[in-house]
Curated annotation (Swiss-Prot):
It comes from the Eukaryota. Eukaryotic translation initiation factor 2 eIF2 is a heterotrimeric complex composed of an alpha (EIF2S1), a beta (EIF2S2) and a gamma (EIF2S3) chain. eIF2 is member of the 43S pre-initiation complex (43S PIC). Interacts (via C-terminus) with CDC123; the interaction is direct. Transmembrane segments: none annotated. It comes from Oryctolagus cuniculus. One of its GO terms (biological process) is cytoplasmic translational initiation. The keyword Nuclease does not apply. Belongs to the TRAFAC class translation factor GTPase superfamily. Classic translation factor GTPase family. EIF2G subfamily. Disulfide bonds: none annotated. It is found in: Cytoplasm, Cytosol. This is Eukaryotic translation initiation factor 2 subunit 3. GO terms for cellular component: cytosol; eukaryotic translation initiation factor 2 complex. The gene is EIF2S3. Member of the eIF2 complex that functions in the early steps of protein synthesis by forming a ternary complex with GTP and initiator tRNA. This complex binds to a 40S ribosomal subunit, followed by mRNA binding to form the 43S pre-initiation complex (43S PIC). Junction of the 60S ribosomal subunit to form the 80S initiation complex is preceded by hydrolysis of the GTP bound to eIF2 and release of an eIF2-GDP binary complex. In order for eIF2 to recycle and catalyze another round of initiation, the GDP bound to eIF2 must exchange with GTP by way of a reaction catalyzed by eIF-2B.
Amino acid sequence: AGGEAGVTLGQPSLVEQDSHSGFKNELERDGGLLLIAGNESKLKHILILGNKIDLVKESQAKEQYGQILAFVQETVAXGATVGQVLGAVGALPEIFTELXIVNIGSLSTGGQVSAVKADLGKIVLTNPVXTEVGEEKSVEKHWRLIGWGQIR
């Protein structure tokens, strides 16, 4: 599926659980959460962004900042800028809606979240990927989105 075809994701607001249980903050983003392995050697110019920062107390925000710095220490993300995404819904620059890497089987491609409705999100792929309609896959390998997708 590629071009206007897309991957429909189940549960677009997703939370990391098992392998990083020490990182206890609940992380959500409308449309999904992309977690990048800290040992991914090809990444450069990393920004670590959080949202909904206005919903926590200043002391909690400082504690979370420290947890993030400790979490990425001795990884390719050590020294990365840590900041927050602030802005009214629909008022953020377009780049914040285009941060998706999608694994389908053993293939990876870019994608853009084009729609979110209830517990489904639609991602339009940037390049064609060979697969079959109805195929269900867990997202895996280096780029991980906690959850699953079904080709439609």
